[in-house]
Amino acid sequence: MELHTHRAISARLCGAPRLLASGGAEVELETVDDMRADELGLVHGGFVFGLADYAAMLAINEPNVVLGSAEMRFLAPVVVGDRLLATARLLGVEGKRHRVEVHVNRSAERVFEGTFVCFVPPAHVLAPATGGVS
């Protein structure tokens, strides 16, 4: 399957697609020193969230997909050097609204889980508005 969204994203910071399927995706991330939050090597949760968000976007794989909201839980700490795998599965679609479940694992241990609500607008969110009054 061809990648249709988030083509310019940094694989080093957000992960690299491992699997693209209709309604699902897997993204792998090796955590690096730039993600370190402290002297013990704790990885800032924003990088784990970014990985999960990217997997959700790829499960939908529409060019204009954006995140609307997320309900998630961090289940275990991640440290520099950990290899993470995010698995995303489309739960349902209602119009432009897509619900995606994402799990992030380090080997067999789950470190993050969440449900993402994404939207697919007809045009890119940064595209100039057309028509209307200026």
Question: Model-derived features: where do they sit?
Answer:
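Non-catalytic linker/capping segments at the edges of enzyme domains
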Residues: 1-35, 129-134
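Short coil/loop residues immediately preceding or within conserved phosphate-binding loops
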Residues: 12, 69, 97-99
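Alpha-helix C-terminal capping segments
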Residues: 13, 17-19, 52-61
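Hydrophobic residues positioned within well-ordered beta-strands of beta-sheet architectures
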Residues: 25-27, 70, 86, 100-102, ...
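Hydrophobic residues in beta-strands and at strand termini
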Residues: 29-31, 74, 120
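A conserved, well-ordered hydrophobic junction motif at loop->secondary-structure transitions
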Residues: 30-50
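Hydrophobic beta-strand-centered segment that forms part of the acyl-chain substrate-binding groove
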Residues: 54-90
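HotDog/MaoC-like acyl-thioester-processing domains
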Residues: 64, 79-80, 89-134
